[in-house]
Amino acid sequence: MKIVGIIAEYNPFHNGHQYHIDQALQKTGADAAVVLMSGDFVQRGAPAIAPKHLRAKAALLGGASLILELPVLFSCGSAELFARGAVSIFNSLGCISYLCFGSECGDIKKLNRLARILSEEPEVYRQLLQDELRKGRPFPQARQTALSVYTKDPSLAEILSSPNNTLGIEYLKALRYFKSPIQPFAIPREGSGYNDTDLCETFSSATAIRNRILNPSLPEDAFSSVAGQLPPASSDLLRKNYQSSLPVTQDDFSLLLKYRLLCESASSLTDYLDVSKDLANRIINQRNDFATWSSFCDLLKTRELTYTRISRALLHILLGIEKDTFRHEPPFCFVEDSGNISGKAKKEWSSTSALYARVLGFQKKDTQILKEIKEYATIPLITKLADARDLTSATQVLLNLDIFASDLYESIITEKFGTPFTNEYQKQLQII
């Protein structure tokens, strides 16, 4: 059985995602698609607009065979951590033949060339990067300039200016790191750019769709303008659950975040993942002006500190994700803060194995995939939390973090929409 893996957020599941699944199956000739999906929090450092089980159901109705949850440590991490965590899980399943991702470039050879340079970090390139960083340039800009000079090909370095290209390169780096046999495929992105805020006729970005849902001209019109941008099943799911479990936004968590910030000092803040000394000092200095999560990110951002990086750091503070959380626990063993650091001062893993794969839902007709995973995987497959026993200490810590994050998300839903609280142990698998 040939299986293609897809790493996604589906925030929400739209026509572009449907196209990606269809193309992934067609281009690879795979029999089924397994999706590793972010849970209730996503990589830009924010809650997903809809709960993970709802988004998982939409993806299953859209043609995915099995949905696994990407642990929150990875789902709200830097592009490098996001990609390496996801690839680690797919690699540990032992039955994934292909990894298919969207890319503005779509040229796997060019992406692989950049991945090789960024993985090996030749001394000349490393020195060029350090020179750019010393000039005070933000890391993405410094890296692109260094690559342009190193490769003598500005068009090649320009590939890094697009977010899906950047993430695709991180997937390729991770495949190299784990010496994975999984074969990568890049699907050229169609329609709007990742960060485009306007709807288009073909494939609009998730950003544009979220903005329209969150800012309707009238409450009853929240989905009328985006109905054509979503597969019918996804549109129906979102519409039926509107104002009962969605939409959820950053600012719904503002009071919780403010409380956490009031409990911290400048020195304690630097214990959290992605919080530098500079950011910690800015948080403390501006804390009295905190109004909402989003406005606080705007207040804190600088040329070097982007909105997304700040938001991601604030999410780590809210969820209690510290740099030392897994420092002594294989397969993580974090060393220093990374993401914007070159050379050896990076998060590294002491093993090529992930910790677990947790099922959110599957199609009944594709239960053979679960059997293959159970046969070939080197990590536990968790279908019921109550059955997740005999886990290593690191696995239990990571799983507890997922449970806490989802219970926190559910608490916001309960408070915002007046619905009964359903804890993570009570939630049912999505089976269609």
Model-based region annotation:
Residues 25-26, 60, 87, 91-92:
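Non-catalytic positions within long, well-ordered alpha-helices that form the structural scaffold/packing
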Residues 69-432:
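Active-site cores that bind ATP or allylic diphosphates and position pyrophosphate for catalysis
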Residues 8, 42-43, 59, 73-74, ...:
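Short, contiguous strand/loop micro-motifs
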Residues 49-53, 61, 76-84:
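Generic alpha-helical scaffold signal
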